[in-house]
Amino acid sequence: MIGMGETIMDIIFRNGQPQAAVHGGSSFNSIVSVGRAGVPCVFVGDTGADIVGRQTLDFMRANHVDTDYCPMRPDVKSAVSLAYLDDNGDASYVFYKQKPEAPKEWTLPQIGADDVLLYGSYFSSCRGMRPLVEDMLSHATAGGAIIYYDINFRSSHSHELVALLPTIEDNCRRSSIVRGSADDFEVLFGQRDAATIYDRHIRKLCPVFICTSGAGAVTVCLPHDTLRFPVPRVDDVASTVGAGDNFNAGLACSLIWRGIRKDMLPALGSEEWQHLLATACAFSGNACRTLDNYISVEFGLRASGLPV
């Protein structure tokens, strides 16, 4: 699996007091969980040439993530976020980071039909990173990989929506799976109903659409059907910061473990999707039980034995 995105240091607060500092970033969180689950993986991105950047790379390597395509850049300061948790473990954020800009040159990992590329968030739609993102998407398309796009559009970027929407639509068009939350689509389209969003906005761009809604049902919209699956209850929630990222990680791992390729996706039936989403929800639920942004090491060691 290949993850592409930003790296950031999350400082997590509860009741106004710092509780933990954890390495983060949407695709970053996913790829760490994939590495802990024993799936070969690589991260494409960058970090600053500073102590935070060095710790970030060391952390990825310790979790079996290839960092050959994530350079430390002297022109970049590592990003930091403050995540303030409410009583439900949901976070509101304050970000301290530079405007994203692609490096002057880069190399990309090999990618083939058995692989999954995961990307998304503001990183994938902002102008500064577009040259790198477009090159990676073309590379993954040529290799026949599953391209998994998590829109993950935060309300903090709503003032840029008009400028970013054409790029978001282009990302959808070039992807095999589009996922987003009901919150994302309320900001983007003023809609929360998955079937309506699919019919009006996604179907013409990408055949496979997954809409999550926190503890609510997961909806999978396909050309031939709309499927809804309940989400297992998680009682001991510590933080939901990595919930969606780990849903992505679990789904990607399950696709790889089950040998599902790009051309098989639109025709998958309800039973197959139930297997895929069970693993996705198991990853997400485990990550919600701690202040970390990823599955636990212990869960990762037994993850491949889940009923995938």
Residue positions per predicted region:
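Short catalytic helix/loop segments, enriched in acidic residues and glycine
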Residues: Q17-V32
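Alpha-helix C-terminal capping segments
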Residues: N29-P40, L85, S254-I256
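Conserved beta-alpha-beta core of the PfkB/ribokinase-like small-molecule kinase fold
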Residues: S124-D199, G216-A217
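Active-site metal-binding loops of divalent metal-dependent hydrolases
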Residues: G5-T7, S26, Y122, I151, ...
